[in-house]
Regions:
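Cyclic nucleotide-binding regulatory module and flanking cytosolic helices
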Residues: 89-137, 175-178, 182-184
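Residue at a conserved register position within TPR or TPR-like alpha-solenoid repeats
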Residues: 14-15, 48-49, 68, 81, ...
Length: 186
């Protein structure tokens, strides 16, 4: 039995990291019956439905957001809500319910959760409408040295290497200062 569970968990991990894809809605639904509480699988399923132009994607993103909140993963829940609300505009009651859920419970990403929970409902809603979920392929450069600072990035999944540069003297050569790995929830 343990061998079967290990294989299933390995498959789920590979689906989540993108090394295995399922393009069949029916097969994905079968997988969700086995793993009904995995928020990442629900998010990927919602993305598949959205790609298929199914309005059911909104419900799937909502379910994923709920599971992310229950798992203490605020940022992932917010991204799911952004996708859901782009399909169907939420009512004021739905916005308030989501805002309240962000402010409750223990969270793995305390800093991000406190950032959003510290906002009023209208502030959080206004901020969320400005957020644009983006995917970057592995190895791509998000921002080049010298680019104008005009965006705020949140790492929702995966990892990012941040490299800071500075000049040794005014007008002198640029020297590499340091690198720092940013992971999800940074």
């Amino acid at each position: 039995m343990s061998d079967w569970v290990d294989k299933q968990n390995s498959l789920v991990s590979r689906i989540i990291d993108g090394s295995v894809t399922i393009d069949s809605v029916t097969k994905f639904e079968d997988l969700l019956e086995v793993f009904p509480s995995d928020p990442e699988l629900h998010r990927i399923y919602a993305g598949l439905l959205q790609k298929e132009k199914s309005l059911d994607a909104a419900d799937a993103y909502g379910r994923a957001a709920k599971l992310f909140i229950e798992s203490g993963m605020t940022l992932q829940a917010i991204v799911c809500k952004i996708h859901e609300w782009k399909i169907f505009e939420p009512s004021q009651s739905e916005r308030q319910t989501f805002h309240s859920s962000v402010g409750e419970g223990e969270y793995k990403d305390g800093v991000v959760q406190r950032f959003f929970a510290g906002m009023t409902n209208s502030e959080m809603t206004a901020f969320m409408t400005k957020l644009v979920p983006m995917n970057f392929p592995a190895g791509s450069m998000v921002k080049r040295f010298g680019d104008e600072e005009k965006a705020l990035y949140f790492v929702v999944s995966g990892a990012l290497e941040e490299t800071d540069y500075h000049r040794l003297e005014p007008g002198g050569r640029i020297q590499k200062k340091s690198t720092k790995d940013l992971i999800k929830d940074d």
